Amino acid sequence: MKCGVFMEVYTQELPLRTSRRVELIDITSMVSGVLESSGIRNGILNVFSRHSTSAIFINENESRLLSDIESMLEGTVPVDASYGHNAIDNNADSHLRAVLLGGSQTVPVINGSMDLGTWQSIFFAELDGPRNRRIRVSVAGKP
């Protein structure tokens, strides 16, 4: 794909209300809606969590796998370990889990669609809920 000098950039914030302390939410359709609204056909799309106790990741939307991911997070970063940050607001595990998963993902946009693999979905990981959250989706490219 050739891309000229001029690109369009479209940004939209998505509100999200979570209901559990740890919750993995498939946001693929929400993000796809932003892409459609952008009118951009070829370029890149970035999904960014505006919070330090949440994350964005890409993986398969299969219930047992999602349960395994939650178990992996608990095993790797237990809630009840002795963390220095807990002296401030008792959620260090949430911050550390967010570091492991990452705060954003970028996906190629080709012919108006996200170029995700067959089994890939975009997830918002709530790691310190329930809360009201905001996700920033930015699309850059050519219409």
Curated annotation (Swiss-Prot):
This is UPF0047 protein MTH_771. Pfam families: UPF0047 (PF01894). Belongs to the UPF0047 family. InterPro entries: UPF0047_YjbQ-like, YjbQ-like_sf. NCBIfam families: TIGR00149_YjbQ.
